[in-house]
Amino acid sequence: MVKTERMQVEEADQTPGNAWLVGLAAWFIPGMGHLMQKKWVRAALMGGAVWACFFIGLAMGGHMYDLSNGNSTSSTLLQVPPMIANLGTGALFIISWLLGVGFAEDVVQAARVTYEYGNTFLLIAGLMNYLVMLDAFDIAAGRKS
């Protein structure tokens, strides 16, 4: 009897394979994980919030972080946490990096009044998308409705 209970617990802990695909899609394109599950309102609200934060951050002149602009090891290490936060936006980060949008080391851009607000919006967009991704993953895994 104990053996069957243990097997049931192990089976309950198994994550369906499509949950990983949904999670990856949700990270890569904000809101896509919920769209794949036909959760239209969640996709519009959660994905839309990430997209809006990202583009508002860019419009305010925010700076996206990567590892290439540090001169010393200590300054490079300090850029890792914000880079991980920015990387949370998935394809938005990758496309911005490829186009060079938001990565400029410009003194004029840094002097803008809205520069720090833009940085904050960009960081929040990435962190929020991590939460949206986990929500889509949990729904696909059956842990949440």
Regions found by a protein language model. Name each.
Residues 2-23, 46-145:
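Transmembrane helix recognition focused on a "late"/terminal membrane span
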Residues 26-31:
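Hydrophobic, membrane-inserted alpha-helices
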Residues 35-45:
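Membrane-interface helix starts
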